[in-house]
Every structure is written in structure tokens, then in C-alpha cells.
Regions:
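Bacterial N-terminal signal peptides that target proteins for export
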Residues: 1-14
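Intrinsically disordered, low-complexity terminal tails/loops enriched in metal-binding residues
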Residues: 16, 20-150
């Protein structure tokens, strides 16, 4: 009888426990991987994977709490983009939200991630490495921009 109570207690504890949320340590893989896929696609003048990656980012950001809501909202908007122009505009909002989220939470994105800025649109983006690949103008102005901080 004691064992049965122990089993029932253990099961009820597991079932009633709050869902596990994504922690700051998970940010590089859960937010940065889809973000970087979007960046690469837009820099290459393509929409390949943009919608799927934006939806994934929105889902992850929803689990991170109120500070990540701008990331979730921006990613959701990007997921509805119908063309490159709309996607690039939404990506600018998403990039602003990502930078703000990192500042607000003290998160570091690691993995050689740098903040770059396009002087033409005055918008940042996060990218791997220091070789500029501008997602706002793609191949027509691929190297336009500068690294702001590493």
C-alpha cells in the first residue's frame, strides 16, 4: 500500500509540474539557428525556409516569457511575409527585437555572433563571423554594412 501511494504521488507530481521552459543556455540553438537560417536566405535573395524558421522562433520565444514577446510577435509577422520586400522589413523588426531581448536578459548568443548594421536602412542584424552579408539588400549590396560589436 505504501508503494502504491509513493507511485501515485510520483505520478501526480510529474503530471502537475509546470512545463519546462527554454532557458537562457538554450538560446544559441533555439533562437539563433532559425534566425541565422533566415539571415542566410534573405542575404541570398531567397525565401527558402524563412516561414518555417520564423514560426519556430515564434514558438520558442513564446516559452521565454514576457521579455521575449517582441521576438515572438516579430517572428510571427515575418512568417506571414509573402515576398522578399515584406520579409526584409519584418526581419528588421525581428533583429531589433533580438538585440533588445539580449540586452534585457543579459543573454549572449555566442558562437562568433556579431551585430552588424546596414547604414542604408539603419537596422541591425545578427550574423555569424565578421564578413558582412547584408540581408536587407541581398546580392545587390551584399557587403554593405559594418560590424558594431562582437
Amino acid at each position: 500500500m505504501i508503494r502504491m501511494k509513493h507511485v501515485l504521488f510520483t505520478l501526480s507530481t510529474l503530471l502537475l509540474a509546470p512545463p519546462v521552459s527554454v532557458s537562457a543556455a538554450d538560446l544559441p540553438s533555439t533562437l539563433m539557428d532559425p534566425y541565422l537560417r533566415i539571415h542566410v536566405s534573405l542575404a541570398d535573395d531567397k525565401m527558402d525556409g524563412v516561414v518555417v524558421s520564423a514560426k519556430a522562433m515564434s514558438d520558442v520565444a513564446q516559452k521565454l516569457g514576457p521579455q521575449a514577446q517582441p521576438v515572438s510577435q516579430s517572428a510571427t509577422k515575418l512568417a506571414t511575409a509573402k515576398d522578399l520586400k515584406a520579409a526584409r522589413t519584418a526581419f528588421g523588426e525581428l533583429s531589433d527585437a533580438m538585440v533588445a531581448y539580449a540586452k534585457a536578459t543579459g543573454a549572449t548568443f555566442g558562437r562568433d555572433i556579431n551585430v552588424a548594421v546596414c547604414p542604408m536602412v539603419q537596422k541591425p542584424w545578427l550574423q555569424k563571423g565578421t564578413t558582412i552579408t547584408n540581408p536587407y539588400f541581398g546580392k545587390s549590396m551584399l557587403t554593405c554594412g559594418e560590424i558594431k560589436k562582437g
